[in-house]
Design a protein with these regions (language model features):
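Short, cationic-aromatic polyanion-contact patches
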Residues: 66, 99-118
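A short, conserved structural fragment
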Residues: 90-98
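Short recognition helix of helix-turn-helix/winged-helix DNA-binding domains
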Residues: 1-80, 87-89, 102
Length: 119
């Protein structure tokens, strides 16, 4: 129970209030690297798509959702997802393994320290 008290103490001193939030039972959560969030040359869409790919990945080491599925879940268009994925690939945050016509791609998520590659 010591860890629970540590969490309670942390919540008392933070500037963000998590009302009614239980990360264990609320459908999970996704950790996103701060260096990705702070990378000014990446668009907002690219950062959100990377986070979405991470949310799929925690079940195993391979991620292969369809772009249409991601667009529907994120409330955006498939072309926006396609551009964001290309941007992430150009900057070294992911590698795309194409599996052929009519099949979803496999996305290898990478961790880039610093600025990443500029495409």
């Amino acid at each position: 129970m010591e860890k629970l008290s540590d969490i309670t103490r942390f919540r008392e001193h933070q500037n963000i209030i998590l009302q009614g939030f239980d990360p264990v039972s609320a459908g999970g959560f996704t950790q996103v690297p701060n260096c990705l969030l702070n990378q000014a040359n990446l668009s907002f869409a690219a950062k959100v798509v990377y986070a979405k790919l991470l949310s799929y990945a925690w079940h195993n080491n391979r991620v292969f959702p369809g772009q249409e599925t991601m667009a529907n879940e994120l409330g955006t268009s498939q072309p926006t997802i396609t551009r964001a994925i290309q941007e992430l690939e150009d900057n070294g945050w992911l590698e795309i393994q194409r599996r052929g016509q009519g099949k979803t791609n496999v996305y290898v998520l990478k961790y880039v320290v610093g600025e990443g590659r500029r495409g």
